[in-house]
Amino acid sequence: MCDEEVAALVVDNGSGMCKAGFAGDDAPRAVFPSIVGRPRHQGVMVGMGQKDSYVGDEAQSKRGILTLKYPIEHGIVTNWDDMEKIWHHTFYNELRVAPEEHPVLLTEAPLNPKANREKMTQIMFETFNTPAMYVAIQAVLSLYASGRTTGIVLDSGDGVSHTVPIYEGYALPHAILRLDLAGRDLTDYLMKILTERGYSFTTTAEREIVRDIKEKLCYVALDFEQEMATAASSSSLEKSYELPDGQVITIGNERFRCPESLFQPSFLGMEACGIHETTYNSIMKCDVDIRKDLYANTVLSGGTTMYPGIADRMQKEITALAPSTMKIKIVAPPERKYSVWIGGSILASLSTFQQMWISKQEYDESGPSIVHRKCF
């Protein structure tokens, strides 16, 4: 493993998107949807070379004739056959590498069940014959990417959100909180409130359009009530969006009502705390001596933290909850959509990390449980 020519592969498997590339790069080479599609109907055209499954963008583009499955639900792998297909697609079609020639760094959700880490390890060594691998917790990588080893990460992606306090590079499992409210739920909510305006979006294809509207036009209001009043009294907050068929729709208070559910999950009919309160609760579960460091290093990560205005709103909400003298700093790096992957790229290319890899030899000697001893 000491020859420097071989780049490690970094694969961040999210509920919505898979990010993959080479350690040492500053951005992932491949970003594609974590979906596997299977044909709904038998092919009628002879010699069309019909495949029995499609992955990623190809599945997305043929979604009209396929049944789509997401093998990762709420950040945790639930379907291993499909997951294997996604990894196969990642190595052979997206990165075009032979996995038996590269060490592979995989990411996992906080509180990932032990059996799952073992299964990931087993598939990498037995199916793909990787020479070495490692499993790292997503939020910890985001913190590394921001240049810190202590802080609390609010990682919110497509399928799940977590608040993860980290001290000197170690996640504190007793204080990690999970919130099943993320990008997918916000897209669903936007579909619902646009329907109230008289626009109908129902199919999975139309859902992609709504996701695009969400990503381009939504923002977080600093003061929700005041923003609602502004929206009601003037058209200054209205924006138009052109649908693929040329029809133009107008969207007003939906722009900030949609992501407001991150702070008020009751909008979605959920009895949960908002992201600000979850972050605060997570900090309060930690030792009193380290709370100051967590308040001063609150790092946002993941695609669902990309809304304009979210950092200022978090600052305001957490300041209201915390002791009045506490210094609070919300860190929102511009590249936070990919900060898990970037942290993995940094980690896997550190010279000090090279002894941390689980080698094929160690795996052959100890079996899948080696992952609990080497990756924590």
UniProtKB/Swiss-Prot annotation:
Modification sites for Tele-methylhistidine: H74
Chief location bin: cytoplasm
Modification sites for Methionine sulfoxide: M45, M48
CDD domains in the record: ASKHA_NBD_actin
Subcellular location: Cytoplasm, Cytoskeleton
Recorded superkingdom: Eukaryota
This enzyme's EC code(s): 3.6.4.-
GO CC field: actin cytoskeleton; brahma complex; cytoplasm
InterPro entries: Actin (IPR004000), Actin/actin-like_CS (IPR020902), Actin_CS (IPR004001), ATPase_NBD (IPR043129)
Keyword Mitochondrion among record annotations: no
Cleavable signal peptide: none
Regulation: induction: By 20-hydroxyecdysone.
Proregion residues excised on maturation: 1-2
An MF annotation (GO) of this entry: ATP binding
Reactions listed under catalytic activity: ATP + H2O = ADP + phosphate + H(+)
Alphabetical keyword list: Acetylation, ATP-binding, Cytoplasm, Cytoskeleton, Hydrolase, Methylation, Nucleotide-binding, Oxidation
A Gene Ontology biological process term: ovarian fusome organization
Tissue: All cells and tissues of the developing embryo. Later in development, expression is higher in midgut, brain, nerve cord, and gonads.
Pfam families: Actin (PF00022)
Modifications after synthesis and translation: N-terminal cleavage of acetylated cysteine of immature actin by ACTMAP. Oxidation of Met-45 by Mical to form methionine sulfoxide promotes actin filament depolymerization. Methionine sulfoxide is produced stereospecifically, but it is not known whether the (S)-S-oxide or the (R)-S-oxide is produced.
Residue numbers of N-acetylaspartate PTMs: D3
Family statement drawn from the similarity comment of this UniProt entry: Belongs to the actin family.
Note: In Drosophila there are 6 closely related actin genes.
UniProt xrefs under PANTHER family: ACTIN (PTHR11937)
Protein name per its UniProtKB record: Actin-42A
Biological source species: Drosophila melanogaster
Gene that this sequence comes from: Act42A
